[in-house]
A protein has these predicted regions:
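A short helix->loop->beta-strand "cap" motif at the edges of active sites that frequently abuts
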Residues: 14, 35-36, 125-128
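Binuclear metal-dependent phosphoesterase catalytic core
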Residues: 5, 67, 95, 118-165
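Active-site environment of divalent metal-dependent phosphoester hydrolases
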Residues: 1-3, 24-28, 44-49, 79-84, ...
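Non-DNA-binding regulatory cores of transcription-related proteins
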Residues: 86-87, 92-94
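N-terminal active-site segment of His-dependent metallophosphoesterases
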Residues: 1-34, 52-54, 58-59, 143, ...
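Helix-adjacent hinge/juxtasegments
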Residues: 36-83
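Short beta-strand scaffold segments in enzyme catalytic cores
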Residues: 62, 109-111, 143-148
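Active-site neighborhood of phospho(di)ester-bond hydrolases with catalytic His/Asp-centered motifs
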Residues: 16-22, 38-43, 72-75, 99-104, ...
């Protein structure tokens, strides 16, 4: 996470930080440069008391807007993303999101669904980007995600390789 902070948190084009959890304290260890932080509870936090100082007030999912794009973030465990990401994507489409970001699998993933793509029992009504940044702390290939919200579309990418410090 420190590498992500050093690379991106001081960039004037960085709008904020999305933290898809399993470890709410991770961000307290680095300088976030005063950026807004959007975060959701993970399955680990489900085992904490609902009013614990670590998890209190942090939602299970969150919808917000940046640059005209509607972004839905969730950890993903409640939608079974380890088995199939499409259920979470159906929900995001129902919420009229432009971008769905989820964690839980600790594996990088990205998918672009153009208008008309079959999803469940219907077609997607507008383009939807689906993105999992992976995990900076666990997994075979530590990674983090970078999402570039441009007027002409969304670019999803991963930074990975070697040990992330």
């Amino acid at each position: 996470m420190q590498r992500a902070a050093e690379t991106h948190f001081s960039d004037p084009d960085t709008a904020g930080i999305v933290h898809l959890v399993d470890g709410l304290a991770d961000l307290s260890r680095i300088d976030t440069n005063g950026l807004p932080i959007w975060r959701v509870r993970g399955n680990y936090e489900d085992y904490l008391p609902p009013v614990s100082s670590e998890s209190g007030g942090i939602p299970r999912e969150l919808m917000f807007e940046v640059g005209g794009y509607k972004i839905l973030i969730m950890h993903g465990h409640r939608f079974g993303v380890k088995e199939d990401w499409e259920r979470a994507a159906e929900y995001a489409a129902d919420m009229h999101a432009d971008l769905l970001m989820f964690g839980h699998t600790h594996v990088m993933f990205e998918k672009y669904l153009p208008t008309g793509t079959s999803l469940g029992y219907r077609a997607v009504g507008k383009p939807l980007c689906v993105f999992n940044p992976g995990s900076v702390g666990t997994g075979l290939y530590p990674s983090y995600g970078v999402v570039d919200l441009r007027p002409d579309g969304i670019i999803m990418s991963h930074a990975c390789g070697g040990t992330v410090r």
